[in-house]
UniProtKB/Swiss-Prot annotation:
Compositional bias segments (type: Basic residues): 92-101
Name of protein: tRNA (guanine(26)-N(2))-dimethyltransferase, mitochondrial
Bias (Basic and acidic residues): 102-111
GO BP, one annotated term: tRNA N2-guanine methylation
Residues that coordinate or bind Zn(2+): 330, 333, 370, 373
CC terms in the record's Gene Ontology section: mitochondrion; nuclear envelope; nuclear inner membrane; nucleus
Region Disordered: start-end pairs: 91-128
Length: 570
């Protein structure tokens, strides 16, 4: 530091001296006690409010496609903090007198105090006792870009631990932290992520937010993260191993990593990937009498990303079995049927008091062969069966994206895509797992592909609900049974299909010729009397959403985009 302060203090303006010192650090970037760094060895990459020195040797990699992930993560942590603070405020109002009595008896020298049910920690030693703060762990930090963005862009952040197991990565984090002047917030750390989290759990120094973004599966880090997160804390989880989670092979590896089998060769495989990850989180949390609440679950490009709130709730742990399911899906026509593992019922006991009875479910819901096409059923799961999103949380994320990030496209370059994808997610049916593609069904029964609004209008006229899905373009989620789906799709064809011209061995022929067997006369008469393809509320909602000028799905942004190879550390 001697070289920066050779001007005598008597003749120097303190402000000017500090400004010159900071400028010199930025320009020459010499770490104290270390040799000068040649800035020509680095590419300076700007993302959000952070600038990182990206080594040209690529010992630590930067993937620009992941900016959407990081923009979304910043926005979601802000939304969680806002909602989290509101919950704490309500709790403080309800227990104001009790907290006042506790404050009078507490030791004023205490450094920190927890408020409410998992509220952000508050600095008791500060002049403002009600000023909240957040501690964040980025367990697998690589360059430190995400941690630096959290420090720059999220209010109330007191500390971000930027951890990595590779010494080269930690050196990169140190350079970037100092280059961005966030040394007081971002703390580079060289450690095994699990060891770090278990250590913090043992010392009761837990994190409010834990971000797990590994190369591949998140499974090895889940147990430690669940135990080291604060009550009501936010976990951000990424899995990039979609060849296992959503591919047509490796069911044994999927089961070993996630405790369930994926929907092999099925269109809904990306949603089943989300449900397998959420089931892993729920099963792990249940061992510690905790539960995870999905706030936002997205299938994005080449990975899945879920945002969950972790809290202690022995009562909700009892519901885990009934919110877990297996799925029977036909290998030929694609129809599927879900089987919950447990059931919940209300019973009347002594003194006319009701109690909750937990029991195993009855099944299976299907025969050995598909009733529509005589195809073979494959089994997927166990996996999570409940809602993927929290509507209130998504609305807060969209509000921040629209209002607080307005006119900040240079900082949040993926604002439009966040708006588009989350608008779809917010309007998804919450109680209808999986989706179907009218294009696929039309190809099965040899029909011209009908307009999406026509299919939705038909299902809506029969009294069923429909929604788009964020996971796949031109696909629908619905609470309609599969006999209604096949019926409506057949009726979408203006001309009656001549079965004599179809190959009897095809799936489409088997479905259409067997209709009297799987669609009873009573149900068919009801469908015939109700069916209409005139616009209705369901089709109107779909068309309104489709007409919005928003970016719904990712277009190929660069040549050879996608997951990068592992960094070369040799």
């Amino acid at each position: 530091m001697e070289g920066f302060f050779r001007i005598p203090l008597k003749r120097a303006n303190l402000h000017g001296m500090l400004k010159a010192a900071i400028s010199k650090i930025k320009a020459n970037f010499t770490a104290y006690g270390a040799p000068r760094i040649n800035i020509e060895d680095f590419n300076i990459v700007k993302e959000g409010k952070a600038e990182i020195l990206f080594p040209k040797k690529e010992t630590v990699f930067y993937n620009p496609i992941q900016q959407f992930n990081r923009d979304l993560s910043v926005t979601c942590i802000k939304a969680w903090d806002n909602l989290y603070g509101e919950e704490c405020g309500q709790k403080r109002n309800n227990k104001k007198s009790k907290k006042k009595r506790c404050a009078e008896t507490n030791d004023d020298s205490s450094k920190r105090q927890k408020m409410g049910n998992g509220s952000p920690k508050e600095a008791v030693g500060n002049s403002n006792r009600n000023e909240p703060y957040i501690n964040i762990l980025e367990a697998l930090s690589a360059t430190g870009l995400r941690a630096i963005r959290y420090a720059h862009e999220i209010p109330h952040v007191r500390e971000v631990i930027a951890n990595d197991l590779l010494p080269e990565a930690v050196e990169s984090i140190k350079r970037n932290v100092e280059y961005n002047s966030v040394e007081n917030i971002v703390k580079p750390n060289l450690d095994d992520a699990n060891v770090l989290m278990y250590r913090n759990k043992a010392t009761n120094n837990k994190f409010h937010v834990i971000d797990l973004d590994p190369y591949g599966t998140v499974t090895p880090f889940v147990d430690a993260a669940i135990q080291s997160i604060e009550e009501g804390g936010l976990m951000l989880v990424t899995c990039t191993d979609l060849s296992v989670l959503a591919g047509n092979g490796y069911p044994e590896k999927c089961f070993a990593l996630y405790g369930g089998a994926n929907m092999v060769s099925h269109e809904s495989t990306h949603e089943s990937a989300l449900r397998l990850v959420l089931n892993l989180l729920k099963q792990t949390a249940a061992k510690y009498k905790k539960t995870v609440e999905p706030l936002l679950s997205l299938s994005i490009d080449f990975y899945v990303r879920v945002f969950v709130k972790v809290k202690t709730s022995p009562i909700e742990v009892k519901n885990v079995m009934s919110s877990t399911m297996t799925t029977y899906h036909c290998s030929r026509c694609g129809s599927y049927h879900n089987q919950p593992l447990g059931r919940i019922s209300q019973r009347e006991g002594r003194n006319n008091k009701t109690f909750t009875k937990y029991s195993v479910a009855q099944g299976p819901p299907v025969d050995t062969k598909c009733k529509f096409c005589e195809g073979t059923y494959h089994l997927a799961g166990p996996m999570y069966a409940g809602p993927l999103h929290n509507k209130e949380f998504i609305e807060e994320v969209l509000r921040i994206n629209k209002e607080e990030h307005r006119d900040q496209d240079d900082t949040y370059g993926t604002r439009k895509r966040i708006e588009g994808m989350l608008s779809l997610a917010k309007n998804e049916l919450s109680d209808s797992p999986f989706y179907f593609s009218p294009n696929h069904i039309a190809s099965v029964i040899k029909l011209q592909v009908p307009p999406l609004k026509k299919v939705v209008a038909g299902l809506g006229s029969l009294g069923f609900e429909c929604s788009l899905t964020h996971a796949q373009p031109s696909s629908l989620k619905t609470n309609a049974p599969w006999d209604a789906i096949w019926y409506v799709m057949q009726k979408c064809d203006d001309e009656k299909k001549d079965l004599s011209k179809m190959n009897p061995n095809t799936t489409g022929y088997k479905i259409l010729s067997a209709m009297p067997g799987w669609l009873s006369g009573t149900v068919k008469s009801e469908y015939d009397s109700k069916l209409s393809f005139a616009p209705n509320e369901q089709s109107g909602n779909i068309e309104k959403l489709r007409k919005l000028k928003i970016v719904r799905y990712q277009e190929n942004p660069t040549k050879n985009w996608g997951p990068k190879a592992r960094p070369n550390t040799s």
